C-alpha cells in the first residue's frame, strides 16, 4: 500500500466539538492536500461525532480508489452502554458497519484499533479484524496507542494462526513526546511496520500558538481549552522545547512548525506525520517543511532539549558493549537486522 509522505488528519472536519472547520473550509483543506499530491487520510468514528467521516467520504466519493482512507474504532458511542466501546468483537463489527455507512464506501483501506482497551483478549481482537479483511470490508490493519509487548503478542498470534497482522502503528510522537523511542519505534523498525505520528506539532505547542519564552498563553476556544489536554501539552518542559524550536525558526527564516516536522523527517524518513489544519494556509505551511534541511548543530540542539532517558534496559546496552565483546566489537559485522 503506497501512501504520501504526510497524512492529512481530519479531526478538524466538522464543528460539533466547538473548534473545528465548516464543511466548506474542510473541503478547501482537502483540495489543498490533494493538489499537493497527498493521498493518505486519517479519521475515526469518534471524531466530531461522525461528521469527520461523513465529510471525508463525500469529498473522496468521485475518486474513491485514488485515496487511502484510514479510520478507527474503540472509543465509546454511548457512555451508558458497556458494549459501545472497547476492542471487543461486538463493538468492532458495529463500528465498522457504521463507519462504512458514514464514509459512503464499501471498504476501508486501513482500519485502526484506536486504543488498547486492556481487557479484550488479543485472540478475539485479531480474529475479529481478520474476519473483516476476509469479508473485504477492510484491506489493512493498524493499531494506535498500545504498548509494544501487546502489539508483539497480537502480531505473533496472528502470524501463527494465519490471520492478518497489524501493518502499521499510530502513536503520539514529536519533539515534546519521544517515549516511543524506548520500545515501540525499535519494534516497528525491526518488524517493518509503518509508523504514523499523531500530534507531531504537539497540539500547536511547536507552532508558537501558545507562546514561547516569558510570553505564554492559553487559547480559549481551542482544543487545548480543556483541563486534561492543557495540562498534558502546556508544560514547562514543552515550553523550553518550543523556545529552542523558535530560535532555530528565527535562524532559518521558517515557521516553527516546519522546524519541528523537519526534525521528525531527519529522525526517520519513514515516519508519516499526521498533520491537521483548519485552513488551507495552515496546511500549506506544514507541507512546505519538505524542503527544509537543518544543520547538524541545529539538530543537536533539538535533540539535547528534547532527549528522553531510555531507562532500563535501553540505557545500559552501550555501557555493556565492552563487557560483552571485549576488544572485538569493531571486527564484528553489526549491519544486521534488529541490531
Identify what each model region corresponds to.
Residues 79-183, 190:
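Glycine/proline-rich, positively charged
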Residues 1-6, 37-40, 64-67, 105-109, ...:
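Short, well-ordered coil/turn segments that N-cap beta-strands
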Residues 180-221, 255:
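Aromatic-lined glycan-binding groove of carbohydrate-active enzymes
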Residues 11-13, 44-46, 72-76, 113-116, ...:
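Active-site beta-loop-alpha junctions enriched in small/polar residues
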Residues 214-251, 266-270, 284-339:
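Terminal-tail/helix-coil boundary detector
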Residues 1-17, 70-83, 107, 112:
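N-terminal small/glycine-rich loop or linker at the start of catalytic domains
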Residues 8, 26, 41, 56, ...:
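Conserved, mostly hydrophobic/aromatic
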Residues 1-67, 134, 339:
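N-terminal binding-site loop/beta-alpha segment at the start of enzyme catalytic domains
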Amino acid at each position: 500500500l503506497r501512501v504520501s509522505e504526510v497524512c492529512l488528519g481530519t479531526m478538524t472536519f466538522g464543528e460539533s466539538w466547538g473548534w473545528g472547520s465548516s464543511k466548506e473550509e474542510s473541503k478547501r483543506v482537502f483540495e489543498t492536500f490533494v493538489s499537493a499530491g497527498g493521498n493518505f487520510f486519517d479519521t475515526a468514528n469518534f471524531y466530531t461525532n461522525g461528521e469527520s467521516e461523513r465529510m471525508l467520504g463525500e469529498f473522496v466519493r468521485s475518486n474513491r480508489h485514488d485515496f487511502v482512507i484510514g479510520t478507527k474504532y474503540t472509543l465509546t458511542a454511548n457512555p451508558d452502554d458497556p458494549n459501545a466501546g472497547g476492542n471487543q468483537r461486538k463493538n468492532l463489527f458495529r463500528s465498522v458497519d457504521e463507519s462504512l455507512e458514514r464514509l459512503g464506501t464499501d471498504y476501508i483501506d486501513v482500519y485502526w484499533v484506536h486504543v488498547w482497551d486492556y481487557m479484550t483478549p488479543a485472540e478475539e481482537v485479531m480474529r475479529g479484524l481478520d474476519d473483516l479483511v476476509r469479508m473485504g470490508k477492510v484491506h489493512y490493519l493498524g493499531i494506535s496507542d498500545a504498548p509494544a509487548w501487546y502489539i508483539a503478542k497480537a502480531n505473533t498470534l496472528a502470524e501463527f494462526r494465519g490471520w492478518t497482522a497489524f501493518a502499521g502503528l499510530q502513536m503520539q510522537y514529536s519533539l515534546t513526546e519521544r517515549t516511543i523511542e524506548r520500545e515501540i519505534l525499535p519494534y516497528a523498525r525491526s518488524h517493518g511496520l509503518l509508523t504514523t505520528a499523531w500530534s507531531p506539532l504537539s497540539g500547536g505547542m511547536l507552532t508558537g500558538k501558545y507562546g514561547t519564552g516569558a510570553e505564554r498563553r492559553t487559547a480559549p476556544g481551542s482544543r487545548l481549552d480543556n483541563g486534561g489536554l492543557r495540562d498534558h501539552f502546556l508544560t514547562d518542559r514543552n515550553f523550553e522545547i518550543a523556545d529552542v524550536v523558535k530560535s532555530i525558526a528565527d535562524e532559518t527564516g521558517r515557521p516553527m512548525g516546519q522546524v519541528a516536522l523537519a526534525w521528525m523527517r531527519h529522525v526517520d524518513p519513514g515516519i508519516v506525520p499526521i498533520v491537521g489544519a483548519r485552513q488551507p494556509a495552515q496546511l500549506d505551511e506544514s507541507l512546505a517543511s519538505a524542503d527544509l534541511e537543518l544543520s547538524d548543530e541545529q539538530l543537536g540542539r533539538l535533540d539535547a532539549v528534547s532527549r528522553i532517558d531510555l531507562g532500563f534496559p535501553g540505557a545500559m546496552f552501550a555501557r555493556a558493549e565492552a563487557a560483552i565483546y571485549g576488544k572485538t566489537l569493531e571486527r564484528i559485522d553489526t549491519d544486521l537486522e534488529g541490531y
